[in-house]
Amino acid sequence: MIGPEHEFSINDENFNPVPISDEILKKIGGRTVNEAKLGRVVIGKELQKHVIELKPARPFESLSEFEETMQEGVEELLSVMDGYKLLGLGMHPLLRLEDAKVWNHRDRRIYQAYDRLFNIKQHGWLNIQSYQLNIPFSSEKEAVELHNKIRVLLPYIAAVASASPICEGKSYYVDTRLYFYRINQKEVPEICNDVIPERISSLKEYRSILNGIYEELRRKGAYVLCREWVNSRGVIVRFSRKCLEIKVMDEQECIKSDVALTAFIRAILRAELEELPVDVLIEKLNSAMRSGTEKLKPELKELLKKSKEHADEEERRYMKVVKLRIEEGSLGERILMNMPEISREEIISLCEELSRCLERNEVYL
């Protein structure tokens, strides 16, 4: 089973972000709702009203079903958007914080609690778009094994998926989203734990970590946030879904690229992986954030080799996209390579190209 969640920004013809997710959801659902079914996908709200979520109405059995259904969902969503455009990436390259609007309908008390604790008027809240992947587990043993394997893979997954090199019209890190994400809850560091989770030996141990977060939130009067989703590490356990949720990836330029990341992760999780100390993982995550795949290529090539060895026939078909990203650079790296001069005009031109990639399901080269 495969459970993807995609986040895309809503834009006008000049790629100014437009905060109208509530209007789109009202058009689809008949009233202002948190989410609404559109064909075989579900369209949902996010904290920021210029971002909209796409997820399947039910988990997928195969990668081909994933690609076909979610691309169909993108096209159906575009058909009800009155000419507005969708854009992937981990951050909107032109968004100004003063122009961002926060969801002000149902669930707003959750966002109000976050704002009271952390001041959400920052890029780490209002300008991040991720591709999240839910990996199911059938037993506690499998959940613990998957959690610990994904923990070791997080820096490498982040490197291949890094796709947020521009913020407010200027170049930053290759994965600028990750930089802001890591500090957006610094007042309660237990929540994010520098993205790398602790190695666990049981789900009881995981629940103990989660309860520690809850205790700190209760001390601050934020009872409404004491839910399993508040944990912001790069992988978390979703007991309500019986799955692990990977949160470290930037949204990509098209559905095919998201499917390729999924194929890579599913295959490599079948391999034996070497345990690494937390300080080494943080160092590698810092490298992924700053320069994408550039300084991690030997390890990434070895992981790609292992993933191919453990991949099924369908997964292997998508490995060429991952190979391209490892050898030629992540989406964020490619963007910087193709933009020797960063100007508003060049960024708009880039956004036009990336928006077409999403519409046509084409990988950006």
Swiss-Prot record:
InterPro entries: GCL_type2/YbdK_subfam, GCS2, Gln_synth/guanido_kin_cat_dom
GO biological process terms held by the UniProt record: modified amino acid biosynthetic process
One Gene Ontology term of the molecular function aspect: glutamate-cysteine ligase activity
Transmembrane region(s): none
Entry-linked SUPFAM superfamilies: Glutamine synthetase/guanido kinase
Pfam families per record: GCS2 (PF04107)
Domain of life: Archaea
Span of the signal peptide: none
PANTHER family: GLUTAMATE--CYSTEINE LIGASE 2-RELATED
Protein name in the entry: Uncharacterized protein AF_2307
